[in-house]
């Protein structure tokens, strides 16, 4: 049966019943007693080791942790880190682990630990919606294994490596997020194939970096005013940035080096995107007549090859 537990780090007690009148003090306690379809409602305040939290916070299948989605979690700060043993990347410093069909909504997450990740998603299909991820020492959200998350309407700012990292064979919907002032806005690697739609990415080192043999689909994203590139493609990656029957709709502009840099071994085909043909590098075919096919001279050989620093692949 669906139930709601309430948590207040200032007035609550973990010996309480977790009701609205007698809330728990910690998310940790609420997660211990939560069952499928449980909602955990958080009051404004700071949730950290000093208030009694034990990290990482693992949200069980079918459980929702809810703050305030209307302001993307302003005033509800969850800050901390604990060791999570990943099947694909060994020990990691993590604030939250989300199991299948878990939901995290309307909170602010910070992980100040070395190489710290805000949310870790491994071969599960949770929802991460309308949160703020800021000052994480690696990335806000990391998805790996066979993950298939929904990452929707979040704000990612000033995270050291990436806003969002999608690795291994992960898929998922990454929609309506804002990523700024971080290393890479979104990093996609290995054989990952997520759908990126309606994201706004600006003032990062590079906006979107696609590596390995990743095959993401990009539609209606804006990547602008990044120090290096709007989109960087390396390795054997081959993103879908538009087709005749499904136009890309991506806008790449005002980036420091290139709006679109293809340093991969594949030719990219761009259809229905807004890209300045004078700000591209590598093998790119503009298949719509609105943008002339660039003839770069000399042939662009990126120096140095854009390899992320810090590397978005955890060690």
Language-model features: where?
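Right-handed parallel beta-helix/beta-spiral solenoid domain characteristic of secreted/periplasmic
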Residues: 50, 62-113, 249-252
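Glycine-rich repeat segments that build the extracellular carbohydrate-interaction surface of secreted
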Residues: 5-9, 30-51, 63-69
């Amino acid at each position: 049966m669906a139930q709601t537990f309430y948590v207040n780090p200032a007035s609550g007690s973990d010996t309480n019943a977790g009701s609205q009148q007698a809330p728990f003090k910690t998310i940790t306690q609420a997660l211990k007693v939560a069952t499928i379809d449980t909602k955990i409602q958080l009051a404004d305040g700071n949730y950290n080791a000093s208030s009694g939290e034990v990290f990482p916070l693992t949200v069980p299948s079918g459980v929702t942790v809810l703050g305030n989605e209307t302001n993307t979690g302003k005033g509800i700060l969850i800050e901390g880190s604990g060791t999570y043993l990943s099947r694909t990347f060994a020990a990691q410093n993590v604030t939250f682990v989300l199991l299948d069909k878990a939901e995290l909504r309307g909170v602010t997450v910070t992980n100040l630990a070395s190489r710290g990740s805000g949310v870790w998603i491994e071969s599960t299909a949770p929802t991460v919606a309308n949160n703020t991820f800021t000052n994480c020492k690696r990335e806000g959200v990391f998805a790996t294994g066979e993950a298939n998350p929904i990452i929707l309407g979040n704000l990612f700012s000033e995270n050291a490596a990436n806003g969002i990292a999608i690795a291994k064979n992960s898929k998922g919907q990454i929609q309506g997020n804002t990523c700024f002032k971080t290393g890479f806005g979104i990093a996609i690697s290995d054989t990952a194939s997520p759908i990126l739609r309606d994201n706004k990415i600006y003032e990062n080192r590079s906006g979107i970096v696609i590596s390995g043999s990743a095959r993401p689909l990009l539609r209606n994203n804006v990547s602008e005013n990044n120090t290096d590139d709007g989109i960087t493609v390396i390795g054997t990656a081959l993103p879908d940035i538009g087709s005749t029957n499904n136009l890309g709709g991506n806008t790449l502009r005002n980036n420091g080096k290139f709006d679109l840099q293809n340093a991969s071994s594949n030719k990219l085909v761009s259809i229905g995107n807004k890209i300045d043909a004078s700000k591209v590098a590598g093998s790119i075919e503009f298949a719509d007549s609105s943008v002339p096919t660039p003839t770069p001279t000399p042939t662009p050989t990126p120096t140095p090859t854009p390899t992320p620093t810090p590397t978005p692949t955890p060690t």
